[in-house]
Amino acid sequence: MKYIILLLPFFGFSQKIFSVDYPSQSDIKVFVVDYESQSDLKVFKVDYPSQSKGNKGLWYFVKYPSQSNKKIYFVNYSSQSDLKIFFVKYKSQSGWRNNSKKYLLY
């Protein structure tokens, strides 16, 4: 029973994202790539917060920083980023391409 309780925070994580205006306000810096093959994470923007369960690239953009799990800043150059993302058209296409970067969204 102890193990289940300890693991729940990892499974209950959702990706509610807030885009900040300055790099110093962010938890991570993100660059949007032109091609899926260049990305660490394929992201699908969902319409409701309840759809953003898990660390699977399903992002819900919130209106206020206090509602978010992570604050991101979109950078202009790939070299400035912590994470490279590619926006996909379908929910089923979302997910990690580079598992070594998963820790950034926990």
Where are these regions (language model features)?
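Sec-dependent N-terminal signal peptides
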Residues: M1-G12
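Repetitive, compositionally biased segments used for assembly/scaffolding
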Residues: S14-Y106
